[in-house]
Amino acid sequence: IMLHAYMLTQSGIPMLYSGDELGQVNDYSYKNDPEKCADSRYIHRGKLPWELAEDKEDVTTVQGKIFQTLDRLEKIRRQEITFDKDADVYTYDVHDDSILCVLREYKGRRFFGIFNFSNQEKTAWMQEKGMYRNLLTGEKAELKDISLSGYEFHWYGN
């Protein structure tokens, strides 16, 4: 989910392959077809196992967690002005090479996407003034020394 959140943080039109929204894994069967084996694009073109879609509403399942989180992220992206195509986009130094922080600014509003690309708990060292809202949970927070679990991300806006 963290990689999809990162992709949705970027400008432009995000792309999901069919099945990504349900956690479908790569299909390597194309390597057994002489006409397709040299074209790695087929890794994403396997048949969709429709039984995965049956659990998309149940957040206790992998499929449900992925589907519901992506749905929420897409809604936030549509609602937040900082995702405008004309927003200024920067990286923000948090003093740890395994954490990427993306800052988007537009019309006086700010968005921070903070992504831990490590499997270990890390701290994003930040000292932002003012309160920000966690766009996923609605909780208010100061952006000071944000702790992230392995592969965790946060989206904050003002």
What label would you give each PLM region?
Residues I1-F111, F117-W125, K129:
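Loop/helix patches that line or flank the sugar-binding groove of alpha-linked glycan CAZymes
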Residues T9-S11, G138, K144-D145:
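Short acidic, Pro/Gly- and aromatic-enriched capping/linker segments at domain boundaries
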Residues W50, T137, N158:
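Active-site donor-binding loop signature of nucleotide-sugar glycosyltransferases
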Residues L103, N134, G157-N158:
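A general secondary-structure boundary signal
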Residues Y106, L136, S149:
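Short, ordered coil/turn segments that flank beta-strands lining enzyme active or ligand-binding pockets
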Residues G113-F115, M126, A141-S147:
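Short amphipathic beta-strand/extended segments with alternating polar/hydrophobic composition
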Residues Q127-E139:
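Solvent-exposed beta-hairpin/edge-strand motifs
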Residues E142-N158:
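C-terminal beta-strand-rich structural cap/linker in extracellular carbohydrate-active enzymes
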